[in-house]
């Protein structure tokens, strides 16, 4: 795990999962070209939300249709072709997988008959998901790419109320060189801590970085893991300056008195707060651009050449001065 994650530069940018494009080829070109850690996007406008993409049009049964086993993401073929044509420089890509707990909760909620044991259903789904993910990870390995698998669990708190336990992810943990958890809702930090993922991705804009979060992220860093800060919202873009402020505040909170803020930043990645499948394409492009500018400012890199309206030189100077004060 460690060697793969150490290939990623501090404050590497990535997307969460869904994108607002209708055509897989357009979505994939953006996911590979606009982010430093490319990812295979979900396309809710064309194929339904993250649950429908995996469960299909009839998720109303507590079971698994034959065509769901080893199902590939809708953009998969285009993604593989794109990363072969334009491989990431560090040889790492990300797969975002709808989590077994979220799928189990969805199946239970939509079924005409109640599923009596959601945790058992989630473990069964996890096995099926792991089979599909293992195939995808092997395909990417065959073209020289290592894969970070991030399990997307927006239904985590609901699953916890149903009695689910962290062992549900064991099959997915074993399916990739490194694995993580993304939670766009309220985060049960003790549960995430006990699960010991290699990467934690969450919405720091909405949920902040309280003591429970700080303790969990410190332990994550001691294991050589990474935190993906969800620091920008495509619905209400704020620009790179506020992203820089937000990342620095979270890093200082985790560092406390015993760590260096720079060490926390070294273990950080940047993303939006959630997938942007419900946003406009222009908003997603701006989000990716703002994240990239913020990352370059925080790292002290030369500003990248991105297709965007020119920023005033005084704005850039203010940003650089703020970072220099860390």
Model features per residue range: what roles?
Residues 1-118, 198, 225, 239, ...:
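Alpha/beta catalytic barrel-like cores
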Residues 25, 69, 73, 119-134, ...:
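Non-membrane alpha-helical structural segments and their capping/turn regions in soluble enzymes
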Residues 27, 31, 190-195, 212-220:
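A short acidic, amphipathic alpha-helical/loop segment
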Residues 80-84, 137-141, 169-176, 221, ...:
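Surface-exposed amphipathic alpha-helices with a cationic face
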Residues 95, 117-209:
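Active-site loop segments of alpha/beta catalytic cores
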Residues 98-100, 154-156, 184-188, 205-207, ...:
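Active-site beta-loop-alpha junctions enriched in small/polar residues
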Residues 179, 226-228:
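Hydrophobic beta-strand scaffold residues
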Residues 210-219, 240-263:
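A short, acidic, amphipathic alpha-helical segment used as a generic capping/interface helix at domain edges
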